[in-house]
Amino acid sequence: MNIIQQLEKEQFDKLSATKTIPEFGPGDTVIVNVKVVEGERTRVQAYEGVCIGRSGGGLNESFTVRKISYGEGVERVFPVMSPMIDSIKVVRRGKVRRAKLYYLRNLRGKSARIVEKKTDRAAATS
């Protein structure tokens, strides 16, 4: 392990001790609470959309969230370990067969929906 990998591992361990990141993947609908700085004030803004892909690993890992805002598609890339991310919450799990859902860019309306993943009833009740 070279020096850069060792430093990245130390930073990753330090950041992951303070931050809790849920397990989510492509197709999942997530709410990302982002810290927004306006002048001297800092506020938290919620960004809800479908995760269309994850890339990278360790400190360099990022994910792309797509939402439709006023009829226009908006995509935003978030680094997982960014200090600007306050929290990540998974709203619903999607059932998809691809790692990257770039085909959603060409779909509109009902065809852009993602089927919800069924969970075990025994696991859900306990």
Curated annotation (Swiss-Prot):
Top-level division of the source organism's lineage: Bacteria
Source taxonomy: Bacteria, Pseudomonadati, Pseudomonadota, Alphaproteobacteria, Hyphomicrobiales
PANTHER family registered for this protein in UniProt: LARGE RIBOSOMAL SUBUNIT PROTEIN BL19M, RIBOSOMAL PROTEIN L19
GO biological process: translation
GO cellular component: cytosolic large ribosomal subunit
Sorted UniProt keywords: Ribonucleoprotein, Ribosomal protein
Source species of the chain: Nitrobacter hamburgensis (strain DSM 10229 / NCIMB 13809 / X14)
GO MF, one annotated term: structural constituent of ribosome
Name of the protein in question: Large ribosomal subunit protein bL19
Function per UniProt: This protein is located at the 30S-50S ribosomal subunit interface and may play a role in the structure and function of the aminoacyl-tRNA binding site.
Alphabetical list of InterPro entries matching this protein: Ribosomal_bL19, Ribosomal_bL19_CS, Ribosomal_bL19_sf, Translation_prot_SH3-like_sf
Pfam family, one: Ribosomal_L19
Gene3D superfamilies reported in the protein's UniProt record: 2.30.30.790
Family of this protein: Belongs to the bacterial ribosomal protein bL19 family.
